[in-house]
Amino acid sequence: MKQRIIHIIIMLMAACTMTAQTTVSGTVTDGKESLAGVNVFIIGTIDGCLTDSLGRFSFETTQTGELTLRATCLGFEDYTLTTHQHSNLHLKMHERATAIDEVVVAASSYHFGKSDNFKTMDALDVVMAGNSCGDIVAALQSLPGTQKVGENGKLYVRGGESDECQTFVNGMHVLMPYSTNTENNAVRGRFSPFLFKGINFSLGGYGGEYGQALSSVLPMETTDVAPSDKLGVSASLVDWNIGGTKAFAKSSLSFNSALTSMGLYDAISPDRYDWTRPYRKLSGEAQYKSELSAASIVKTYVGYDLTSVGQNIADRQLSLCEHNIYANATLKTNIGRGYTLFTGIANSSVINDIDDALIHGDHYHNFRNEIHLKAEVRKVFSPSVKMSAGAEDYLRHSTKQYDANGYDLDYNLLAAHVDAQLRVVPRLFLSLSARAEQASYDGQWLLMPRMTWSYVPNKRFQLSAIVGRYSQVAEDDYIALRGKRLQQSTADHAILSMQYATAKMLLRIEPYFKKYHHLPLLTDGTYTADGYGSSKGFDVYGECRSLAKNLNATISYSFNDSERLYRDYTSPTTPDYTSRHNLRLTLKYGIGKVIFGLADSYASGRRFATGTTPYYNSLDANLTWLVSPKIIVYSSLNNILGRTNVFRYNADGSAVTANRDRFFYIGIFVSLKSNKAYDISNF
């Protein structure tokens, strides 16, 4: 028995010895250097191994004849080789090219929150910093490229007027994104930051989808369908809010109402002005969002603001009342074969009535309305090609009456665009777009080509170059006075952007140049399109999170040199709203549930016919206390040192300053549901 077992073992060993053992060996490189950790194996078997630190591999197999090898490695394209050779193999792998949808070109744009292609900073971090006091516009003014114009608080970008920056909600235009106020008092943005999952601020060089903005665009994307019910309140010395959401299976309905009143604050801390009626704003908003399918979503929004204020000015009692209504509805759906369709409609209406506007006993009335229609088709054809094309129409109506003088103006703007984003080679990307626009009152078509080259060698570094042409119609007053024969203004942008980013720091440097053509110019008592101008400079933005634990520091600096011949200027002059130097330093430090913030803002003096203003400086502090997941207390003190900043000079040489040197704000956010306080989101 034992002998039989021994014979069987000997026969099995002989059979194994007779089976051919083949050694497969070689090296793996990327064409320049050896690659370690590459998985090399024979397809259809378990035979294989990982390459060593020198890129070498060697394993045995029972396979004979022709072999099909595959090599896989993170960040590289899979490599397949069919060969009869078993040794001294040389496998050359290629780095996996980034798909066009995976690239986020940061050139001349800043992104907050989450949008279709961006995921960076939460909107709460942006708003609860510095002196923003919950205002998107004030928060964005901390970025490089923006100018400090304290007497109205609007966005001025890279030497451009405030109306050269246009706002879009879900891709649809907003005619008037600001609240109103009396002269020399700062306004606020009329939208809550908590409405949006993405705030994407472009300082210039934007694509063909957007138009009618000579300098910049501010596209904001509202949140999607809410997954749960929400209810929350917030209160401060100047405003009171309540907002909530009812969530359904595949849809949600939201509301928000707010009352802003300076009456209590003015009673506690009077300012320099004589108010006959304190500033008050009553606003309400509602949203309905529905997921029709996995690839289709409908979003609707409607908002209404009523603003009222009265002020004693010299020998008159100015009384202002404004109604501002904005509504939009959009549909985004997959229409098959990889195509995505976007359609939208928006309506903006603004009604202004002012008594004692300029002199005692006069009356000013202005009604503006805009209907915006838009359709766009998008498709990703391959990892290297992405395209979109669309058309839109702006239908505008404006009436103005000042005592016996006035006008009634109607016109529309047609536009079409085509955009293509291409991956030229693995690290080089090209964005091409063309936009054509026509104003009905002159019938002239404008063709505006735009191009962006982006070199993205790795996740840390980006280098981009942007050129493009942009257009915008003049203000309604100028079009009406010219008898609807005023050519559109245009601006040519050239931008170079360099960005280096790691987990601990960010550095961005952007030189730019803008050339303006056909600006409105007062000539012989009427307006022509013979004005021109230029704006050049550079922006620097740095952020560091490694100075100390829980400490975040930022610095933004802008240099701008602008010159224009427009409006009633008699020679090319630096516009009075621009300052040559703008600098802002911020620090944010967290200890447990408390976050401290400190910001110092500086702007050089602005030039006026009656002189140059002193430099602007404001040291601001804020504190956020996360009392619990449902309660947040936020406070801020602006201009701690109490410096009296001069914003500009009147024609008689008198200085225009803020209505108060310091402003203190304290507010509380409370969630009445199970979600976190900052999720009440005014929705």
Model-derived regions, located:
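Periplasmic-side early beta-strands and strand-to-turn transitions of outer-membrane beta-barrels
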Residues: 213, 225-228, 242, 247-320
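Conserved C-terminal beta-signal and adjacent last beta-strands/turns
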Residues: 245, 465, 552, 575-683
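Short, acidic Ser/Thr/Gly-rich low-complexity loop/linker segments typical of extracellular
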Residues: 46-56
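Periplasmic N-terminal accessory/gating domains of Gram-negative outer-membrane beta-barrel systems
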Residues: 111-165, 171-206, 223
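Face-selective signature of the C-terminal outer-membrane beta-barrel domain
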Residues: 254-255, 285-307, 318-443, 450-456, ...
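Gram-negative outer-membrane beta-barrel transporters
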Residues: 424, 513-515, 529-606
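Membrane-embedded beta-barrel scaffold of Gram-negative outer-membrane proteins
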Residues: 342-352, 456, 462-464, 488-545, ...
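Short, acidic, small-residue-rich periplasmic hinge/interaction motif at the N-terminus
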Residues: 29-31, 39-43, 72-76, 84-129, ...
